[in-house]
Amino acid sequence: MRAIIIGIGQCGTKIADIFSLVDFEALAINTSRGDLEYLKHIPPDRRILIGESIVGGKGVNANPVLGREAMKRDLPMVMKKISSLVGFEDVDIFFLTFGFGGGTGAGGTPVLAEALKEEYPDSLVVAIGALPLKEEGIRPTINAAITIDKLSKIVDSIIAIDNNKLKESNEDISQAYERINYAIVERIASLLALIDVPGEQTLDASDLKFVLRAMGSFATVGYAKADATKIKSLSRLIIRSFENEGLYLDVNIESALYGLVAIHGPPEALKANEIFEALNELTQRIRGKQIFRGFYPDPREREVEVVTLLSGIYESKSIEEIVITAKKYAQEFLKAKEEGESKKKKLLSGLPDFDDIYPGEADDQS
């Protein structure tokens, strides 16, 4: 299976840079020259500065309108660079990594996603977006809500990562984001690494594409890992990967249409009866009842790793909170703006023009 990672904006390019570290094909797109230069693993010839004629390489300061215009203006250059990377080999999935709350990512990702869908109709376009932390304030929340709406009409799936779930209580924001970015890549890379790999029961690219072709709905990744010698219940470990503690988004899993579970570990730990017990529970719980599974016994491993992907989700507390908060603020803002305009109009109404106060002055001077 071939996947290309395209990072957009500061958050997205940092995530893409980590994917590049673990040998994925990756591109970085940003309006900030400094952020692009900061990257460590994506080669310089795969870093694309956009919007230089608009913001001069200084970023868009979390303004998605500028981010959108930067991507639109330089889209031909971006698509040419992507075409050069794609070459003559098919791409199964384009993963677009970005931050929902930023400017370049929130504004530019929908523009690029639409262009990719048109240019590569046989490839999936999947958004991997980090939801803003509550501490970041209202502006990122509004950016996130509007971007969710736009992307849901374009991409095949939105894998939303709720940073509020992953942040530890004693971390500051910068520490949290760095650790979360690595966690996102580790989980998704673990899943992709098992696609088309020989195993007891394997997952192939068509399975993953089927699960992610979900009409712009949400998807979430679950994860659980433990030392094989310390596992008392394998079924419990697997179940943990698709319960709230293991998921990267607060969702109602019963609303999911599709599921995919990959289990990797030492052969003696992968007990069939416990695996099927857990998978049967997941099948019963999700609405779509369709579960793809892969079992990968590996005598070199000492840990059991479980990666779960649920898609076709339309019920998420994480998403609902963002959208409701954004709507409330937008209504209050628009009301305040309207009231302000009305007060200004009332205050200034009745003022004369200069010519009414100084009649004939211009004629006298001439």
UniProtKB/Swiss-Prot annotation:
Cited SMART domains: Tubulin (SM00864)
Record carries keyword Nucleotide-binding: yes
Cell location: Cytoplasm
CDD domains registered for this protein in UniProt: CetZ_tubulin-like
Keywords, comma-separated and alphabetical: Cell shape, Cytoplasm, GTP-binding, Nucleotide-binding
Biological process annotations from GO: cell division; microtubule-based process; regulation of cell shape
CC per GO annotation: cell division site; cytoplasm; microtubule
Molecular function GO labels: GTP binding; GTPase activity
Binding-site list for GTP: 10-14, 103-105, 136, 163, 181
Chief subcellular location: cytoplasm
Gene3D superfamilies: Tubulin/FtsZ, GTPase domain
InterPro entries referenced in this protein's UniProt entry, alphabetically: CetZ (IPR032907), CetZ_C (IPR048737), FtsZ/CetZ (IPR045061), Tubulin/FtsZ_GTPase_sf (IPR036525), Tubulin_CS (IPR017975), Tubulin_FtsZ_GTPase (IPR003008)
Top-rank taxon: Archaea
Transmembrane region(s): none
Pfam families: CetZ_C (PF21011), Tubulin (PF00091)
Family label: Belongs to the CetZ family.
Reported function: Involved in cell shape control.
HAMAP family the record matches: CetZ (MF_01946)
Protein name, entry field: Tubulin-like protein CetZ
Provenance organism: Pyrococcus furiosus (strain ATCC 43587 / DSM 3638 / JCM 8422 / Vc1)
Encoding gene, per UniProt annotation: cetZ
